[in-house]
Amino acid sequence: MAETSSTTAGAQTLLRGLAVLNAVYNGCHDLKSIGEFTGTTRSTTHRLVTVLVEQRYLRHVPTQGYQLGAKL
């Protein structure tokens, strides 16, 4: 079965989301350091982090930055 472009795009988004989780696990706690770790732009990083916070895979603590969330 051949992959469609939407399947490929979905896989890329999933990989980027996992890279964000890996970045936070490895000590990146702000958008700048997460973006540098993952190689994504600030806007892409913000979009990914926002979804991960909404889904409780990450949480944001104002004085400490992003941390792994309740689902992890």
Predicted feature locations:
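N-terminal helix-turn-helix
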Residues: 2-72
